[in-house]
């Protein structure tokens, strides 16, 4: 392998032959303009290829969620619920939601580093539906979120998580979480385009995500909190996402919370999707 | 005049305080190579980006085959391709993957996109590198895959932004051959470059731009005549013969002679009227005269006008009227 690589690096490439070039240049019929769905899926395929070529980037959707789950279960389990296994039944849906929402910020970072590269100039000179490059990104990220969800679920099951909602409830809960994360990620695509360096994207993401995930119903029951904090927790979208996911996993579907999450997702998508595309077109 | 592929008038782009492009007019006839020549920071890339719909002009307007680059951007995008100064391909993907990606995005179905990718890789001599990530390509190979991606959908207008900057001479020649083949096919090419000989080799008309303005425009012949035929560089064995050599060169070449900081070197700038052949004749005559006068010459060379010299000549000329007016 390495020997062929060395050999290939020697620049002994044949010069392009004019007649071959002429042949590829003979006017082919230009195909019809591709649909928005088709170009989005193509950009999603690009994201998958990047994962295939650099599989190390899956570290944040495998090791990080495992660490979160183990850490908080054993740290708080005994104190809050008497035993880690007991606590896990309460914590797992929440830790899953918080881990996925945490890793959505990598979307902003990769948009920020990728957009500066010349290839985006090419994408932006193609006659295609403008948001498809961004949508494709997020489609690739959905795979990452799915991997993280499955990893957390796997670790949870090994540690003794027994969801009452069964396979259907858990699958539906993960789907809802992915749908919300898709919408939520547009916040980071916006910051990815808005801010100048990946460090600042990281900084802003942390500043938003830490309060959102910790000041919620993920780790403890909000009833134990002071009133002013409860007020914040109640309006925090993460609280509603976790409540919905928890209800679905336990088999006791809370229609109100699920609707809330879907509407909130739609609103976030409408606002930040629009802002992202504005910045993208102006960049 | 034949149909215009690119037509820009009064194009302006301002970044903060900097007027990167400060009122550029261009008229590029269809089916030709048009060279935009200028140093780094002259505004070449900014101008190209506006023409390729990547940047919105702050003033003026531009049309590609009659379509406005702002109001009809989508129609323009279906006609143009851009090969940027920095690789406009995805370095993490392989050569094949890049071309299939662009093929899919331009509306080819998967099998057609694959077939087109293979065909292009073969034509560009990249079949062996097809499965490697572009980041492992050499500079010349990157350029080729980049141009291959640009012509995948046979554009009407191709923008090449400094296509050979940083390439070795052989790769540079190959890129030139590719550009010639593309134009022969009927695509209009707008090429930016820092090298006069590149514009000379490829372009039929050239615009020289500096600080966001077109400072000269014309056919190669016109431009060269205005700049001068080149320079004769002479190095003597003995420094004390230099003033004698200077006088002799001024007399035989009727040229402006510059004494270099090196005490044995001097350069004569040939005037613009002489053709290239005339320049060589003049130079060999001068060499003979130097020998006859007993001046020992170590090295002697005839240089094409460099971009620096073009600039010097052009900016001097634009500066003169102001001075005489003052």
Regions from the language model: what does each represent?
Chain A
Residues 3-9, 15-21, 26-27, 69-73, ...:
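Alpha-helical transmembrane segments of multi-pass membrane transporters/translocases
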Residues 67-72, 88-159, 180, 184, ...:
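Hydrophobic alpha-helical transmembrane segments of multi-pass membrane transport proteins
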Residues 130-205, 252-279:
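Alpha-helical transmembrane segments and their short interhelical loops
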Residues 72-81, 159-164, 168, 195-197, ...:
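Short helix-capping/hinge motifs at transmembrane helix termini and TM-loop junctions
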Residues 55, 74-84, 212:
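Short, hydrophobic transmembrane alpha-helix segments
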Residues 59-64, 196-217:
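Pore- or pathway-lining transmembrane helices of multi-pass membrane proteins that form conduits
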Residues 16-17, 22-64:
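Aromatic- and glycine-rich beta-strand/loop motifs that create alpha-glucan
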Residues 50, 82, 162, 213-270:
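Membrane-interfacial helix-loop-helix junctions in multi-pass membrane proteins
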């Amino acid at each position: 392998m390495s020997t062929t690589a060395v050999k290939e690096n020697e620049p002994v490439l044949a010069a392009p032959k004019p007649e071959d070039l002429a042949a590829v240049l003979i006017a082919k019929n230009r195909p019809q303009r591709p649909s928005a769905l088709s170009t989005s899926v193509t950009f999603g395929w690009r994201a998958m290829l990047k994962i295939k070529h650099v599989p190390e980037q899956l570290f944040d959707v495998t090791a990080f969620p495992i660490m979160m789950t183990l850490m908080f279960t054993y740290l708080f389990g005994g104190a809050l619920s008497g035993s880690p296994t007991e606590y896990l039944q309460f914590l797992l849906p929440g830790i899953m939601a918080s881990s996925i929402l945490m890793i959505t910020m990598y979307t902003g970072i990769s948009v920020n580093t990728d957009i500066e590269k010349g290839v985006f100039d090419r994408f932006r000179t193609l006659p295609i539906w403008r948001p498809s490059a961004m949508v494709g990104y997020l489609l690739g990220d959905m795979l990452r979120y799915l991997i993280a969800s499955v990893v957390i679920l796997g670790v949870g099951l090994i540690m003794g998580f027994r969801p009452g909602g069964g396979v259907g409830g858990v699958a539906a809960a993960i789907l809802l979480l992915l749908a919300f994360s898709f919408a939520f990620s547009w916040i980071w695509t916006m910051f990815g385009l808005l801010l100048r360096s990946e460090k600042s994207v990281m900084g802003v993401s942390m500043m938003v995500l830490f309060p959102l995930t910790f000041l919620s119903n993920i780790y403890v029951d909000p009833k134990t909190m002071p009133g002013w904090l409860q007020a914040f927790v109640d309006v925090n979208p993460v609280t509603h996402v976790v409540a919905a996911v928890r209800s679905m996993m336990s088999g006791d579907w809370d229609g109100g919370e699920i609707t809330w999450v879907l509407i909130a997702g739609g609103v976030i998508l409408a606002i930040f999707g629009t802002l992202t595309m504005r910045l993208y077109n102006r960049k | 005049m034949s149909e215009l592929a690119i037509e820009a008038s009064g194009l302006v782009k301002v970044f903060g305080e900097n007027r990167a492009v400060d009122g550029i007019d261009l008229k590029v006839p269809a089916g030709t190579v048009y060279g935009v020549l200028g140093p780094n920071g002259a505004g070449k890339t900014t101008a190209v980006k506006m023409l390729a719909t990547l940047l919105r002009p702050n003033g003026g307007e531009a049309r590609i085959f009659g379509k406005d680059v702002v109001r009809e951007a989508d129609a323009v995008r279906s006609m143009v391709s851009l090969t940027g100064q920095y690789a406009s391909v995805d370095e993490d993907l392989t050569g094949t993957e890049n071309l299939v990606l662009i093929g899919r995005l331009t509306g080819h179905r998967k099998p057609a996109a694959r077939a087109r990718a293979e065909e292009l890789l073969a034509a560009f001599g990249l079949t062996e590198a097809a499965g490697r990530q572009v980041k492992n390509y050499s500079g010349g190979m990157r350029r080729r895959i980049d141009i291959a991606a640009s012509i995948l959908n046979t554009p009407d207008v191709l923008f090449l932004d400094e296509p050979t900057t940083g390439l070795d001479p052989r790769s540079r020649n190959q890129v030139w051959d590719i550009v010639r083949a593309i134009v022969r096919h009927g695509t209009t090419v707008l090429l930016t470059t820092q090298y006069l000989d590149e514009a000379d080799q490829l372009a039929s008309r050239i615009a020289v731009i500096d600080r966001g303005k077109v400072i000269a425009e014309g056919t190669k012949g016109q431009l060269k005549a205005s700049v001068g035929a080149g320079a004769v560089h002479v190095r003597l064995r003995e420094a004390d013969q230099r003033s004698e050599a200077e006088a002799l060169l001024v007399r035989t070449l009727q040229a402006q002679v510059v004494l270099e900081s090196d005490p044995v070197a001097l350069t004569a700038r040939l005037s613009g009227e002489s053709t290239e052949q005339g320049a060589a004749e003049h130079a060999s005559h001068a060499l003979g005269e130097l020998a006859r006068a007993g001046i020992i010459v170590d090295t002697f060379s005839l240089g094409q006008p460099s971009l620096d010299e073009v600039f010097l000549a052009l900016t001097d000329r634009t500066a003169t009227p102001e001075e005489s007016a003052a």
